[in-house]
């Protein structure tokens, strides 16, 4: 897949949701919430500042991130679902 987000946008693949309860019961799609954690797949060149300079993004490809429940725009590419969002919609980078 070749996608290059513009400016301060990033492409995120959601982490797989847990489909099995602690007791071993399979949870249907309709009963699970979409995860708010994902992996950065692609990043733009950076945020264009008021003075015209470009600030590089703090996140990079491969980072595991947390984002808001309603962040980003869902897109489907090559049969897979991704989110395109601005860097400011990312709340944290998960390390370790």
UniProtKB/Swiss-Prot annotation:
> In which compartments does the protein localize?
Cytoplasm
SMART domains according to UniProt: Cpn10
Q: InterPro entries given for it? A: Chaperonin_GroES, Chaperonin_GroES_sf, Chaprnonin_Cpn10_CS, GroES-like_sf
Mind listing the GO biological process terms from this record?
chaperone cofactor-dependent protein refolding
| Keyword flag Nucleotidyltransferase | no
Query: Molecular function terms in GO for this entry?
Result: ATP binding; metal ion binding; protein folding chaperone; protein-folding chaperone binding; unfolded protein binding
Per its UniProt record, what SUPFAM superfamilies does this chain match?
GroES-like
Sorted alphabetically, which keywords does the UniProt record give? Answer: Chaperone, Cytoplasm
| Cellular-component GO terms for this entry | cytoplasm
Q: How does it assemble?
A: Heptamer of 7 subunits arranged in a ring. Interacts with the chaperonin GroEL.
Q: What family does the database annotate? A: Belongs to the GroES chaperonin family.
What is the role of this chain?
Answer: Together with the chaperonin GroEL, plays an essential role in assisting protein folding. The GroEL-GroES system forms a nano-cage that allows encapsulation of the non-native substrate proteins and provides a physical environment optimized to promote and accelerate protein folding. GroES binds to the apical surface of the GroEL ring, thereby capping the opening of the GroEL channel.
Q: What is this protein called?
A: Co-chaperonin GroES
Q: Which gene encodes it?
A: groES
